[in-house]
Amino acid sequence: MSAPVLLIDIGNTRLKWAWCNAGEVAVQEPGRLPTPWQHSGAVTHTDDSAMNTLAAVLRNLRGEGPVPSVWITNVAGPVIAGQVDAALNAAFGDGASVQWVRSAAAHGSLVSGYREPTQLGVDRWVGSIGAHRWLPGETLLIVTAGTATTLDIVTAQPGGQGRFEGGLILPGLALMLAALARNTAQLPALDVEDTGTAAASRLPWADNTHDAIAAGCLAAQAGAIERTWRTLSERGPTRCLLSGGARHALAGALAVPFEMHDNLVLLGLHAMATA
């Protein structure tokens, strides 16, 4: 990289970003996913001051150096896209080269098996690119625990190729908890952070309403992951990768082996930017 690279993942709730210094080479431990950036952060994009904060941080990171190339995924719509464009202009002027990534039928050695490849959520596609880039030749169950929880399947193909097979989408843990509180008369409202006791319990049920809600929502999430993992594992070795803002809450509830990564979408953007 002759110039820095800025990676931006605009999700439904938060904007996550990572800054890769020019000339830095990603180092991977054998069989593990790297985190090939030197600075990273996140803002809640519904916060009125979020874009000003982002612009100030990026301006400081650049300093007197060259303008970065920018790679972005966005699932939050055109309004936030315009706000991010304005923040980038505030940080770098109009000199930044910005790539708004879209889903496609293939990228490198990964082929999309989606019925309509361009209709696949770009976050799911790019996250799969990132995982496959560093774990070629492996069948992967990629779990992203965010506003929605997505399960995406990449199967190993001959010659190190990969195929995105499809996946599942279900309400995220926070959405499940909020739906119960909103649509019932007497059940309390819980946050994702309130599920820790249920996740640590040796029993899959609870003796109080608070923990019963947490245990039920965790069981729904974990059950989808474990069922999919078992189905894939019947065909051959499968690695489960867990990412997203609620990954730590889900981690305590899973009964299958998994590996965590901070942000697979940013990892996929890095793979595309450095291809």
Curated annotation (Swiss-Prot):
Entries under Pfam families matching the protein: Pan_kinase (PF03309)
Cysteine disulfide partners in this protein: none
Residues that hold ATP according to the record: 9-16, 147
Domain of life of the source: Bacteria
GO annotation, biological process: coenzyme A biosynthetic process
Cofactor(s) this protein cannot do without: NH4(+); K(+)
Main location: cytoplasm
Co-factor binding details: A monovalent cation. Ammonium or potassium.
InterPro entries referenced in this protein's UniProt entry, alphabetically: ATPase_NBD, Type_III_PanK
Catalytic activity of the protein: (R)-pantothenate + ATP = (R)-4'-phosphopantothenate + ADP + H(+)
GO cellular component: cytoplasm
Keywords: ATP-binding, Coenzyme A biosynthesis, Cytoplasm, Kinase, Nucleotide-binding, Potassium, Transferase
EC annotation from Swiss-Prot or TrEMBL: 2.7.1.33
Keyword Cell membrane: no
Pathway info: Cofactor biosynthesis; coenzyme A biosynthesis; CoA from (R)-pantothenate: step 1/5
The protein's enzyme class: transferase
Active site: 123 (proton acceptor)
Residues the entry annotates as binding substrate: 114, 121-124, 209
Signal peptide residues on this chain, from the entry's feature table: none
Location(s) in or outside the cell: Cytoplasm
Matches recorded under NCBIfam families: baf, PRK13328.1-3
Function: Catalyzes the phosphorylation of pantothenate (Pan), the first step in CoA biosynthesis.
Subunit structure: Homodimer.
PANTHER family: TYPE III PANTOTHENATE KINASE
Designated name of the protein: Type III pantothenate kinase
Protein encoded by which gene: coaX
